[in-house]
A protein has these predicted regions:
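Scaffold/interface architecture of coatomer-like assemblies
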Residues: 46-340
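Intrinsically disordered, low-complexity proline-rich regions
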Residues: 4-16, 22-42, 83-84
Length: 340
């Protein structure tokens, strides 16, 4: 009996270590979310697409889709109901979409706009040698303050050798605009470990939200993370988390990395592998953040299907296309392999 009690104590200590970088108030939030996850299990199935439902495996792919407007066409002067009708006509129907999973054409069950609120984590490299000052870093969460839509919430986390919560999930502009004093540049960056903590302890409990987003602010450098890059990327893809990056100049100048991609390549794979995009810190950050928020609210669709004729032990490339040339599509590049 004593030995069993000791093992339980050790497990509790392990859990404490995992969340040590997150303050008590967030631990409470995570615990409550985990309890609620039982009631949200059906939503979890749709988001992860990894559990059979009624004998079939429901899978969801997040897609950014929009029509390219002809610049030569006159601007619409409609208002009220007429404007609403015009907006409805711009919605892209599933009939003009084709979808291939691992080279096998799939029957699309639904392709519909996702106007639900977003949960966005701004993950900022707070390490000593990053080629950017804290004032510029603080400008990123501040840029979200006027741009997030109703229901959206943003969390700010800084990382060096460990992640630390700067601002918990909030839609309060004052909190998002006052992170400068909480930033400090120290130590070395463990980006992959920080992303893993965000995935496991922050976004996984938020599985009821279909829009779970990470905005990485940094150059993509990782030093000595415990989790391997491929394992991390597979987790993000399985959970349908979208990664954006606001890229800082590479402090390594493209130097080769042992057992990890180069910094710029890491950001490229993280964004392309999850359907996100890369922006440059040298560009107007306010414009970049506005584009992120606008496309999350206005251009995000969910494609739902039951995979047929696929092999889950293989990496499966995804191909989504449209019969209409004016429609642009962006989505994660592939489903990761899974052992049987």
């Amino acid at each position: 009996m004593n030995r069993r009690r000791d093992r339980e104590t050790e497990r509790r200590r392990d859990g404490e270590t995992k969340l040590r970088s997150i303050p008590p108030s967030l631990r409470l939030s995570v615990s409550l979310s985990l309890c609620l996850s039982v009631s949200l299990s059906l939503a979890a199935l749709a988001q992860s697409g990894r559990t059979p439902v009624s004998g079939k495996r429901v899978t969801v792919v997040n897609v950014f889709a929009h029509r390219i407007e002809d610049p030569n066409q006159p601007r619409s002067l409609l208002s009220g109901d007429a404007l609403k009708k015009e907006a409805e006509e711009k919605i892209i129907p599933k009939q003009v979409i084709e979808f291939y999973d691992g080279g096998v054409r799939q029957q699309i069950q639904a392709f519909s706009p996702d106007a639900t609120p977003a949960r966005i984590v701004v993950l900022m490299d707070n390490s000593l040698t990053l080629q950017s000052d804290t004032k510029k870093l603080a400008g990123v969460p501040a840029a979200f303050a006027p741009e997030i839509y109703e229901g959206d919430k943003v969390m700010v986390i800084g990382y060096d050798t460990k992640p630390e919560v700067i601002t918990e999930f909030t839609d309060d502009p004052k909190q998002l605009q006052s992170t400068l004093s909480l930033l400090r540049k120290t130590d070395t960056p463990r980006l992959f470990d920080a992303l893993n903590v965000v995935m496991e302890d922050v976004l996984r409990p938020e599985v009821g939200f279909s829009k779970r987003v990470i905005v990485v602010v940094g150059d993509g450098l990782d030093r000595d993370s415990k989790i391997k890059f491929d394992e991390l990327l597979s987790k993000l893809q399985d959970e349908n988390v979208t990664v954006y990056a606001i890229q800082v100049r590479d402090r390594t100048r493209g130097a080769l990395r042992k057992d990890a991609p180069k910094p710029a390549e890491a950001l490229k794979q993280l964004t392309e592998g999850t359907g996100g995009r890369i922006y440059s810190m040298d560009d107007d950050v306010k414009t970049s953040v506005k584009e992120i928020c606008d496309e999350l609210r206005n251009n995000r669709y969910q494609l739902t299907y039951y995979p047929e004729g696929i092999n889950t032990i293989n990496k499966r490339l995804l191909l989504i296309s449209s019969s209409e040339a004016s429609i642009q599509l962006r989505y994660k590049g592939w489903h990761p392999p899974h052992k049987m």
